[in-house]
A protein has these predicted regions:
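Generic secondary-structure signature for well-ordered alpha-helical cores
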Residues: 8, 94-97, 125-126, 165, ...
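Acidic-enriched catalytic cores of C-N bond-cleaving enzymes acting on peptides and small amides
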Residues: 141, 150, 171-223
């Protein structure tokens, strides 16, 4: 509800706290021109657990400024960035500088893999329709070096079952002669990547686009 209040105060036409299969999702928008391009801003309001609390110098849920930095749980992931996006939107609205439609979606399950987000997006795809998505959950290379992140790593999960003897075997009689499933699995895992970190699974890179030379050159100039 607090995020919905902030969006309305910043100038949104509407801000809704909407149900999902899990935690509520906040949606807000301001339409300046139905024919204009639309930017959808994604962020998340959930955070990692703050425990152990005794290691904090201040209350993790009461922001405190020390040495020019804001200290609080979520100040860097992702409440701080989310708040900046809202205040930037507020500035554009109040100064009549907003030329594009803006939509916001704040979810509350990013830290556990966003299990409810896909279903919510499918159910409300027309409401969330946009020309570009801006994710406010990335990093900067430095305080004085604004960074535009155009890609992030993904996640993949596999379950591997290695079977061996169907009963206990005496290590003195069979050790070394009969493969231990644990050793076999360790060998498989050790070969998933090579010395340069490239994944060796056949076909893994078949549908992966190469980084364009122009982007490589830009990356090379980053300090």
């Amino acid at each position: 509800e607090r995020w919905a209040q902030l969006l309305l105060a910043a100038g949104a036409d509407e801000a809704l706290v909407m149900p999902s299969a899990g935690n509520p999702i906040v949606f807000g928008q301001k339409i300046v021109d139905p024919k204009a391009k639309t930017v959808l801003i994604y962020a998340h309001y959930d955070v990692m657990p703050a425990e152990p609390l005794e290691l904090w110098k201040s209350n993790p849920f009461e922001p405190e400024v020390r040495d020019g930095h804001i200290w609080a749980r979520g100040a860097d992931d992702d409440k701080g960035q989310s708040f900046i996006q809202v205040k930037a939107f507020e500035y554009l609205v109040k100064n009549n500088l907003l030329t594009h439609n803006v939509k916001y979606i704040f979810e509350g399950e990013e830290e556990i893999g966003s299990p409810s987000l896909e279903g919510f997006c499918r159910e409300h795809k027309e409401l969330l329709k946009a020309d570009v998505i801006l994710v406010s959950d990335t990093s900067m290379l430095g305080a004085d070096l604004p960074s535009l992140t155009t890609g992030l790593r993904g996640l993949a999960y596999w379950e591997i079952e290695v079977t061996g003897p169907n009963r206990d075997l005496h290590s003195g009689h069979f050790g070394g002669a009969v493969a231990n499933p644990i050793n076999v699995l360790c060998g498989m895992i050790s070969k998933v990547t090579d010395a340069d970190g490239r994944i060796t699974v056949p076909g893994f890179y078949d549908d992966v686009e190469e980084v364009p030379q122009a982007e490589r050159e830009m990356i090379a100039h980053i300090p």
